[in-house]
């Protein structure tokens, strides 16, 4: 009889020990990511769930999405946040909801508010965002890696790389991209475009980079490997896209939360590089891309 009691006591102890982390995890206040419905649809609900799950494990606290209507005013966003959690650990806002972030911080001074500014211009006014953590995408680091990735995909063919880049990225992005090629003995030739209308058919094209411009190129189905800076659900992207650069709030959440917890009022966050088509890239190029981080 005593042995049975001891046995069941041990089993109960093991079960309790296993349950404690689960209980503690769900007892912790969540991180909230505010997003409008159009972005949620673009990114993909199942993809958001996966990213939130991984971020939750990384931070050891729940990460939840606050869905706001595309035309939501600042007050409506407050209601949407309150419906998800009345006591969040931190709330992440995209730049388009900057006014809602400021209002939330005024009403909830005990909760950290983070504004993810993405690739917004450096000279944008930020004085109005006092007491709000503001983080940007690390454009130079991203384009340095994109340049290295494009060179790896070229694989020494000495072909041409078409780089479609929105105007506001031209200075920092272009310089960083070129730096990635500068150390190569025989670098591929990058050709920069601000829009697809400037582009015409090019022979010896080994790679295409789409960074805020030139998305029309994907309609060509040319077979040339494409590096795409986008939030679009990969399941909706043509097979020519071999590498996606993702700076969405769900990807940036863990880093942003740690920076805010450390008291960093501003800072830069790198994007995630997601390989979609390993066979089209090739094993050697894939190894080089992974080495870039």
Role assignments for model-derived ranges:
Residues 239-293:
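Structured C-terminal subdomain patch of bacterial secreted/periplasmic proteins
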Residues 142-185, 264-284:
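An alpha-beta-alpha
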Residues 122-148, 238-250:
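Short beta-strand elements at the ligand-binding edges of bilobed clamshell
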Residues 30-74, 170:
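Extracytoplasmic "Venus flytrap"
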Residues 8-21:
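Hydrophobic membrane-insertion alpha-helices, especially the h-region
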Residues 71, 135-143, 164-175, 191-198, ...:
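Hinge/beta->alpha junction and helix N-cap segments in small-molecule ligand-binding domains
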Residues 74-87, 194-204:
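Short, well-structured alpha-helical segments in soluble
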Residues 92-95, 111-125, 226-232:
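Short beta-strand elements of ligand-binding domains
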């Amino acid at each position: 009889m005593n042995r049975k009691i001891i046995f069941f006591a041990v089993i109960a102890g093991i079960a309790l020990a296993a349950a404690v982390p689960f209980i503690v995890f769900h007892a912790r206040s969540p991180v909230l990511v505010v997003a409008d419905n159009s972005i949620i649809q673009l990114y993909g609900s199942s993809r958001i769930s996966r990213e939130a799950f991984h971020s939750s494990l990384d931070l050891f606290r729940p990460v939840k999405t606050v869905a706001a209507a595309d035309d939501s005013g600042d007050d409506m966003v407050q209601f949407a946040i309150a419906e998800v959690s009345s006591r969040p650990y931190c709330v992440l806002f995209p730049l388009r909801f900057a006014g809602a972030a400021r209002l939330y911080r005024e009403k909830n001074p005990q909760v950290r508010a983070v504004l993810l500014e993405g690739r917004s211009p450096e000279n944008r006014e930020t004085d109005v965002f006092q007491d709000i953590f503001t983080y940007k995408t690390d454009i130079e680091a991203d384009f340095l890696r994109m340049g290295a990735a494009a060179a790896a995909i070229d694989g020494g063919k000495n072909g041409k790389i078409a780089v479609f880049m929105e105007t506001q990225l031209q200075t920092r992005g272009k310089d960083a991209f070129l730096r990635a090629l500068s150390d190569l003995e025989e670098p591929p030739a990058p050709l920069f475009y601000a829009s697809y209308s400037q582009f015409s058919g090019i022979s010896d094209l080994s790679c295409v980079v789409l960074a805020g411009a030139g998305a029309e190129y994907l309609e060509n189905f040319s077979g040339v490997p494409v590096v795409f800076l986008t939030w679009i659900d990969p399941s909706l992207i043509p097979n020519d896209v071999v590498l996606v650069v993702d700076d969405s709030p769900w990807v940036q959440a863990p880093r942003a939360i740690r920076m805010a917890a450390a008291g960093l009022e501003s800072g830069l966050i790198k994007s995630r590089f997601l390989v979609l088509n390993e066979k089209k890239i090739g094993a050697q190029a894939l190894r080089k891309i992974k080495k870039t981080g």
